[in-house]
């Protein structure tokens, strides 16, 4: 990939707007591994910063694509679509298995919000 200095995983708030991925996904790393046809490494890089890519890839506003330096001269890298395909492939190939319910432990929790932070 010809990113130069990538801003897609930057996740920086500048004047009230987020530039790049607010989850700080390692977009250049997993996109590069995807280009090199390394599915295990691609998945590993994606899961390093994002515990729920199966959800976030569907609701993502693709701020990484808006910050993509490739988009200055060409179309930006389709990181949102790539993230979706990576996780779908991982489930299809058995690289990820659904986690089993650990059962009740007697503790109570409150979840505030329905976004990625609430899920974590």
Q: What role is predicted for each listed range?
A:
Residues 1-108:
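Ferredoxin-type iron-sulfur electron-transfer modules and their immediate structural context
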Residues 120:
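Short alpha-helical segment within the catalytic ATP-binding CA
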